[in-house]
Amino acid sequence: KTTTSTLVAWLNRALTGGGSAFLGGISKNFGGNLVLGDGPRLAVEADEFDRSFLRLWPDVAVVSSADADHLDIYGTHEALREAFSQFVGQIREGGALVVKQGVDLKIGNPGIRVYRYSYDEPCDFYARNVTLLEGGHYRYDLVTPGGVIEGCTLGIPGWVNIENAVAAVAALWCASERDGEPLDAERLREALASFEGVKRRFEFYVNTPRQVYMDDYAHHPRELAAAITSVKKMFPGRRLTALFQPHLYTRTRDFYREFAEA
C-alpha cells in the first residue's frame, strides 16, 4: 500500500505539477510522508487496521488485498471483507475502483467504474514483455484500456514493485479520464524511472556482486512471500539469509503457520 500510494503521489506531481499526499512511509523523493501542493488531487494511504478507512469517501480507490489481517479488531475474515465492501461503497458517484486481479469484493454501487490490475496476467491494467535488467530492475510495457505505454522502467528493483506501479498508473489513468486529461506517456515514463521508493519498503543498503543487504517492512505472510520471491528472482542461485521481525503479538499468533510457510 505504501509504495503504491507514494507512486500515485509522485506520478501525479510529475503529470500535474501539484497535488498533496498523506503516506504511510517516508518517501525518498519527497523527503517525508506529508506532501502539500497545489491542485485538487490528494493521494491518501487508507488503513483498515482500526476501520479508519471508513472515514474516507474517495473518487478513485485502489484495493491491493483483502487478506485476513487485524483479526483482533475484526474477529473474522468475513467481517474484514464486509468492511472492505463498505469502503468500496463509499466511492463517490462517477468514481472508479481499481482492484487486484483475484481479490474478491462485494461491489454494491453501480455508479462507479471497476477495473482489474495484475503483474502480468491479462486484464484491464497489466505489464507485458517484462525483461529483467542488471541490478534487479525491469523493463516492461504497461497495458491500459487506452493503449500500451511501451518501454517503462521503474527506479526501484523487484517484480513486486512492477505490480505496484501498474496499480498506481491505473489510479492516475482513472483520475485523468474523469478530468478529461489523457496521460502523457513520455512524462509518465520519466516519472516511473525517477521514483526512488520508500524507506523500509524493499530498500537496499548494499547491492554489490558479492553482497546484498536489503530491508522490507513485509509484515503479513503474503507480503513476506512476495518479498522473498522478488529477491530470489533478482538474484537466482544466490544464498538467502532472512532475519524475521514479528510485528504484533496478535498477528503472529493468528498466522504463525502461514509465516512459517512463507
Please state what every model-predicted region is.
Residues R51, Y119, T131-L132, P145, ...:
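Short polar/acidic secondary-structure junctions
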Residues A21-G25, K100-Q101, G111-E134, T153-W159, ...:
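Beta-strand->loop->alpha-helix junctions that form or flank phosphate-binding loops
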Residues G135, Y140, P145-A262:
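Nucleotide phosphate-binding/pyrophosphate-handling subdomain across enzymes
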Residues T4-A9, R13, P122-R128, G151, ...:
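Short, basic phosphate-binding NTP loop
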Residues N29-F30, D124, T250:
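Generic structural signal for helix capping and beta-alpha/helix-loop junctions
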Residues F49-S52, A68-L71, P122, G135, ...:
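Short, acidic Gly/Pro/Ser/Thr-rich loop/turn segments
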Residues K1-Q101, L105-R113, V166-A175, F235:
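Phosphate-binding loop of NTP-binding sites
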